[in-house]
């Protein structure tokens, strides 16, 4: 994990102060614009501003992405993130460990300074009870981080 940049902390602080729902709706629309002059400029400005390189990506040409969202969630080459030999602790994402600690009475401090209930996050009270007394970790994905989430190869995704 990399250390948190000052810009990351400022970005997180701004997210707490701004009308996030409205901001999210606006960004959702902007990231799906397919008009080539706009999306190509948007991608190039973003790449330059955050120092993003595409040498690890399967698609290495910025203009080849259908929209900004396709660029932002780009796939990496299989060799880009080799797994460590067992036994090892692996992160499911690129990012910075921002918070960690014990689950206290089903509650945990989670994303962007908001307190969340484990049952709400898992959408199941019985599943949440299994984690009582356990620990949590929050990994912050900065704009320059790879934005796909991975799970262990031996895992089984049984719900969304």
Where do the model's predicted regions map?
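Non-catalytic terminal segments and appended small domains
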Residues: 1-160
């Amino acid at each position: 994990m990399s250390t948190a940049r000052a810009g990351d902390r400022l970005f997180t602080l701004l997210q707490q102060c701004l009308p996030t729902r409205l901001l999210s709706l606006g960004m959702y629309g902007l990231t799906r614009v397919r008009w080539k002059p706009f999306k190509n400029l948007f991608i190039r400005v973003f790449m330059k501003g955050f120092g993003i390189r595409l040498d690890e990506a399967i698609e290495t040409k910025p203009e080849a992405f259908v929209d900004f969202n396709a660029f932002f969630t780009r796939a990496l080459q299989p060799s880009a993130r080799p797994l460590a030999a067992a036994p090892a602790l692996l992160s499911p994402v690129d990012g910075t460990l921002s918070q960690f600690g014990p689950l206290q009475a089903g509650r945990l401090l989670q994303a962007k300074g908001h307190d969340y209930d484990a049952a709400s996050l898992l959408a199941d009270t019985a599943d949440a009870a299994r984690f009582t007394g356990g620990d949590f970790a929050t990994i912050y994905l900065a704009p320059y981080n790879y934005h796909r989430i991975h799970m262990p190869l031996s895992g089984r995704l049984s719900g969304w």
